[in-house]
Amino acid sequence: MVKKVSRRLRDAQAKVENKAYEPLEALTLLKELATAKFDETAEAHIRLGIDPKYTDQQLRTTVSLPKGTGRTVRVAVITRGEKVQEANNAGADIVGSEELIEEIAKGMMDFEVLIATPDMMPKVAKLGRQLGPRGLMPSPKGGTVTTDLTGAIAEFKAGKLEFRADRTGIVHVQFGKASFSAEDLLVNLKALQETVDRNRPSGAKGRYWRTVYVSSSMGPSIQVDISALRDLKLAEG
C-alpha cells in the first residue's frame, strides 16, 4: 500500500533543498516547518560508519543537553532499604523494590528512565524481555546503574539522555522542542555531536560520520553539513 503523504508535509518538503545546510540554517528551517498544532520534538538522525553486530563497534552512552529536553521526564527507581527514601527525596516519580519489578513484568511502563542500584540488578535482569526492546534496561554505561541516586535522578530530570546506535548504525536522539530558539537547539546538537565523537567505538574503521539529518516530529528531514557542525565553536555561556 502506498503511504499517503499529507499536503502539509508535502508543502514542507518542497521548502527543503537537496543539500547539506549550515547547522544554524538547518535548525531555523526545522522551526519554520514545524507547523503541527502541538510543540513538536526536534530529532537528530545520525548515520555512522559502524557495524553494531561487532561488540567493538557498538555505541551506547549518555549526553547531557545543556538547554534541556523541553519535556518532563518520568524517572522510576528500583532499590531497597534506606535508598528508597533517598530516591523519593530526590524527586523520583516511581520508587519500589521487588513489587515494582513485578509491576513492570506485568506491563507497567509509565516512565522514560529506569534507574537501579547495583544490588537490585540480578532481579532487574529478568525484565529483559520488557525493558530490552524499549532501551530501558539499566546499565552502568548509561548511568542508570548507580548508588548515587540523588545525582542520577537530578541529571536525567535536567536533560541527560541515554542513546545508542541501532543495528544499522544509526543514532536517533530527541534534542529539544521546536519552540526552542534555533541557537538553543544548536547548543544541544553540538553537545550531541561532541558526545558521539568522544565515544567513537574502538573498532570503527574508515569514515565515522556518514550523514546527519534533523527534523521536527511531523516535519521533513533536513540534511546538516557534518564538517560545519564538527568545526563549529560555540561561545561559552
From Swiss-Prot:
Keywords in alphabetical order: Repressor, Ribonucleoprotein, Ribosomal protein, RNA-binding, rRNA-binding, Translation regulation, tRNA-binding
Top-rank taxon: Bacteria
A GO biological process held by the record: regulation of translation
UniProt xrefs under InterPro entries: Ribosom_uL1_bac-type (IPR005878), Ribosomal_uL1 (IPR002143), Ribosomal_uL1-like (IPR023674), Ribosomal_uL1/biogenesis (IPR028364), Ribosomal_uL1_3-a/b-sand (IPR016095), Ribosomal_uL1_CS (IPR023673)
Role this protein plays: Binds directly to 23S rRNA. The L1 stalk is quite mobile in the ribosome, and is involved in E site tRNA release.
Subunit relationships: Part of the 50S ribosomal subunit.
Name this polypeptide is given: Large ribosomal subunit protein uL1
Species this protein is from: Microcystis aeruginosa (strain NIES-843 / IAM M-2473)
Organismal lineage: Bacteria, Bacillati, Cyanobacteriota, Cyanophyceae, Oscillatoriophycideae
